[in-house]
Amino acid sequence: MEFSVKSGSPEKQRSACIVVGVFEPRRLSPIAEQLDKISDGYISALLRRGELEGKVGQSLLLHHVPNILSERILLIGCGKERELDERQYKQVIQKTINALNETGSMEAVCFLTELHVKGRNTYWKVRQAVETAKETLYTFDQLKSNKVELRRPLRKMVFNVPTRRELTSGERAIQHGLAIAAGIKAAKDLGNMPPNICNAAYLASQARQLADTYSQNIITRVIGEQQMKELGMNAYLAVGQGSQNESLMSVIEYKGDPNPETRPIVLVGKGLTFDSGGISIKPADSMDEMKYDMCGAATVYGVMRMAAELALPLNIIGVLAGCENMVDGRAYRPGDVLTTMSGQTVEVLNTDAEGRLVLCDTLTYVERYEPDVVIDVATLTGACVIALGHHITGLMANHNPLAHELLSASEQSGDRAWRLPLTDEFQEQLESNFADMANIGGRPGGAITAGCFLSRFTRKYSWAHLDIAGTAWRSGKAKGATGRPVALLSQFLLNRAGQNDVE
């Protein structure tokens, strides 16, 4: 789908469709008022007859409106004008895309980007419109034999901006929005792929393909079990030893800053391509969704793609920690004591708390890069879902400025996160009689104790942890990966690159 921006008056648009907003109760937006005046009150007369109230989600398609050059006008309900916030704006864009697709409008000029959204500028509105449009049109049908194809799908969307001086900002918003949307799609595609296809080797192949596509900036290295053994990554190896699929750690190195002294930003993604729970096996109900336990790695992959596409002037290292936790005679057991790459020992009390074991060795491994910051992304704990639901990602950090950067990026992108504490009281729950620590700390504060566990392996650098167990995928009828938090981390990197146009 093609996107562009222009600045022009609605009456001069010669398009298949013009999209304008209507507020509740039956109040025309400024652009709709202009069209109404040109059409001699045609639109307002329809509203007086009760054709459209203006509630969010409502729409009305008009054909051959008097004195209007465009074939159609699509009226979109925007709710009450003073209540138009970020969430409603995205709902309005989503409704617009669906309505245009359903009615066969292959192109449209959209004036919704001129609506006032409190605290948001034109760049934000255009970028969010692009990202939302791509999200709305996303389908995962690679494995279906009968694919549903629309006869006249929407192919071109032009966003109108109020003044010509905003065209540059609008064009940059489209560029950023398309790159972020492509990263989100890549993450969703990986997450939705079934575990018999998407194993650690598949993740590694995708990482290598990324290096082939962006060969000027990206180098990918894949570390197998033999090298992990030589490195002493025994916790990582223990998790995967019950699987027939080899554990593989894919390291994607992106160099966009020519200064060799610039320290890299490191992103680490948990890549459990299937998590049965191991000996501490999970309940059968919804176990199929444990293919999503690699959404942290999928996120890192999507973000690395975004950075390469935009050629960000940063040095970034993305690590996909690929592994599979299966039940087998060789599987690790509750009661085992593992010596991690850091030299610290861990008593395994639950084999289903495996993500932190994979991550702890990976977090130790990345010390060699002398990173500026390290951010890990993981579907780590059900406790985070209980704490924050399915709407907000859990954030923990050992460095306040980094935490504030991520929270700011979450607000700017609309990909929300909330900070949880990491205090010594929670550390005490990890005490073990037989090792330096246990791999679980009991039910109370489970998301926090998991973060505390990881913090013991991140003392040599600034670190943040994103627990996406509640936000990485949806269940039920709309089951599928969400691609979160690609948008959050993309915004973080844009801010670091000095390309922050968001208000």
UniProtKB/Swiss-Prot annotation:
<keyword id="KW-0479">Metal-binding</keyword>
<dbReference type="GO" id="GO:0005737">
    <property type="term" value="C:cytoplasm"/>
</dbReference>
<keyword id="KW-0031">Aminopeptidase</keyword>
<feature type="binding site">
    <location>
        <position position="275"/>
    </location>
    <ligand>
        <name>Mn(2+) 2</name>
    </ligand>
</feature>
<dbReference type="GO" id="GO:0030145">
    <property type="term" value="F:manganese ion binding"/>
</dbReference>
<feature type="binding site">
    <location>
        <position position="354"/>
    </location>
    <ligand>
        <name>Mn(2+) 1</name>
    </ligand>
</feature>
<feature type="binding site">
    <location>
        <position position="352"/>
    </location>
    <ligand>
        <name>Mn(2+) 1</name>
    </ligand>
</feature>
<dbReference type="InterPro" id="IPR008283">
    <property type="entry name" value="Peptidase_M17_N"/>
</dbReference>
<feature type="active site">
    <location>
        <position position="356"/>
    </location>
</feature>
<keyword id="KW-0464">Manganese</keyword>
<dbReference type="GO" id="GO:0006508">
    <property type="term" value="P:proteolysis"/>
</dbReference>
<dbReference type="InterPro" id="IPR043472">
    <property type="entry name" value="Macro_dom-like"/>
</dbReference>
<feature type="binding site">
    <location>
        <position position="354"/>
    </location>
    <ligand>
        <name>Mn(2+) 2</name>
    </ligand>
</feature>
<comment type="similarity">
    <text>Belongs to the peptidase M17 family.</text>
</comment>
<dbReference type="InterPro" id="IPR011356">
    <property type="entry name" value="Leucine_aapep/pepB"/>
</dbReference>
<protein>
    <recommendedName>
        <fullName>Probable cytosol aminopeptidase</fullName>
        <ecNumber>3.4.11.1</ecNumber>
        <ecNumber>3.4.11.10</ecNumber>
    </recommendedName>
</protein>
<feature type="binding site">
    <location>
        <position position="275"/>
    </location>
    <ligand>
        <name>Mn(2+) 1</name>
    </ligand>
</feature>
<feature type="active site">
    <location>
        <position position="282"/>
    </location>
</feature>
<dbReference type="Pfam" id="PF02789">
    <property type="entry name" value="Peptidase_M17_N"/>
</dbReference>
<dbReference type="GO" id="GO:0070006">
    <property type="term" value="F:metalloaminopeptidase activity"/>
</dbReference>
<feature type="binding site">
    <location>
        <position position="270"/>
    </location>
    <ligand>
        <name>Mn(2+) 2</name>
    </ligand>
</feature>
<dbReference type="InterPro" id="IPR023042">
    <property type="entry name" value="Peptidase_M17_leu_NH2_pept"/>
</dbReference>
<dbReference type="Pfam" id="PF00883">
    <property type="entry name" value="Peptidase_M17"/>
</dbReference>
<keyword id="KW-0378">Hydrolase</keyword>
<keyword id="KW-0645">Protease</keyword>
<feature type="binding site">
    <location>
        <position position="293"/>
    </location>
    <ligand>
        <name>Mn(2+) 2</name>
    </ligand>
</feature>
<keyword id="KW-0963">Cytoplasm</keyword>
<comment type="function">
    <text>Presumably involved in the processing and regular turnover of intracellular proteins. Catalyzes the removal of unsubstituted N-terminal amino acids from various peptides.</text>
</comment>
<dbReference type="InterPro" id="IPR000819">
    <property type="entry name" value="Peptidase_M17_C"/>
</dbReference>
